[in-house]
Amino acid sequence: MEQNLPSRITKLIKKSESGDFASSYQLYKVFGSKEYGVEPDEKMSDYFKELSAKQLEGGQLRVADIHLENYKGFESLIMDFSMKKNSTILVGNNGCGKSTILDAIQKGLTHLSSRLSTRSHNGDGIEKHELRKGQNYASIAINYDYMGIRFPMIIATTEPGYEDRAKSNYSGINELGSIFKTAHSINPNVSFPLIAMYTVERANDVSTRDIENSEEIKEAQIWDKFKAYNKSLTGKADFKLFFRWFKELIEIENSDNADITALRAEIRAKEKDLDNPLLKALLAENKNSETTKKLLEDHQNSLKVLKEKLNSYYSVNSKTLHTVEDAMYSFLPGFSNLKLQRAPLDLIVDKNNVSLSVLQLSQGEKTILALIADIARRLTLLNPNSVNPLDGTGIVLIDEIDLHLHPSWQQNIIPRLEKTFKNIQFIVTTHSPQVCHTIDSQNIWLLKNGQKFKAPKGVRGAISSWVLENLFEVAQRPPEDKYTKLLQEYKNLVFSEKYASEDARKLGATLSQHFGPDDETLVELKLEIEKRIWEDDFEKDQ
């Protein structure tokens, strides 16, 4: 059907032909409906749908925003996730609604997952008991973003007789799922996005049973991309399935070429080149010079060539195995040489050159191992043709990300997640200042009394006690503690000019003995006393 098309449509066609997904998608919509002032043309609509499917590669899937109405404790909440960085942190007291927001997003993701991986349009709904008390309807509205296009959805439920108050609508994600399926029919190796949720139950102990029972999983496993969505939103990393999968990969790996081992060692050495402290300092001093830019460009190009060469050597299974290993080693410093033990059946890893069963690791180490292994396994299945499957896109929700982690690990968890999984959007909850002070304030939401608030400026890089007091609204010292009260009493004596009294001297000595003379507050009070004595002496001399 020939049409005289408006200039805005011809401009879209030019952009579409140059590879712009957003333009192709808009044209698919334009020719498929009368809403846009152009005569519908089914053939043209199908053409641009297929073209947009071919242009999917390289995009990032994101939750752009969410709107809750009468869902659990929230009357109305709109939360924007279109931040600069990939991670968003939700903080607040117990019961403030952090997990409720993750649950709401998870419900939406079940609908998206089914549209990507199956022919059904199943997904979780809002249960009657999840309606806010006294209300007759509830809804969860989510906007997903893919390559600049918004794909909306609404999950709603109503009491009988109030059906007009809210209605579910899945048209946006139906279209997104349809485009991905079209892309898969054109190219079965096209990358799909990861969708996963990890609740506090992910920390359930990795046990001997997980290893022993892995044999219950039948031999005939087809590890295709759609298996990556299996149980991805149930909340727990499936270590039993991971062990079975890892065991099969190792059995295949045993027949691999020695060239792969040498090439991988060369790549690791190349990647470590820029970590040299002296070289880092030199590059930082001359970061804008042409020589520095050329050096970095040459380094990246040579690394790319090596990785492409490695990719050509690899079987899919061998590449997958090393991808998962590398991900785990990046999170567990000092760990290496993950291997299978046949009798008794076990998974062994070297920790600081000492071989240990994974069952002997600390709870925090096992929690990280299971989490990272699960994410990496799913990404490798979803990105079968990628040089680095860990660069795949997706959305991952993690409740209480600090669970079982030492404070130093809490401090590193978000930066390492972002470094290892560069294109994943992480939405996490935490009670830890150590997690928060590695993230810009604009990426943190504070929840309180059913409302959201932006974090105060300066969280990133701040000392933990400042974050504790200014973000979490927790006093730096326990207010009801005996020594906190004594310290406040001593402070009052100093600032009321009674620092020379017997009570003040005794109190100062007691506190110095308890906290040590280098306590920050005691040092400040000592300087304050010296200043006041100097001022008194100065006045006497006048």
From Swiss-Prot:
Keywords: Antiviral defense, ATP-binding, Nucleotide-binding
Domain of life: Bacteria
One Pfam short name: AAA_15
UniProt motif ATP-binding: location: 92-99
GO molecular function: ATP binding; ATP hydrolysis activity
GO biological process: defense response to virus; DNA synthesis involved in DNA repair; double-strand break repair
InterPro entries referenced in this protein's UniProt entry, alphabetically: AAA+_ATPase, AAA_GajA/Old/RecF-like, P-loop_NTPase, Retron_ATPase
SUPFAM superfamilies cross-referenced by the UniProt entry: P-loop containing nucleoside triphosphate hydrolases
SMART domains: AAA (SM00382)
PANTHER family for this protein: ATP BINDING PROTEIN, DNA REPLICATION AND REPAIR PROTEIN RECF
Purpose of the protein: Probable ATPase component of antiviral defense system retron Ec83, composed of a non-coding RNA (ncRNA), a reverse transcriptase (RT), this protein and a putative HNH endonuclease. Expression of retron Ec83 confers protection against bacteriophage T2, T4 and T6. At multiplicity of infection (MOI) of 0.02 cultures slow growth when infected with T4 but do not collapse, at MOI 2 cultures enter growth stasis.
Protein name according to UniProt: Retron Ec83 probable ATPase
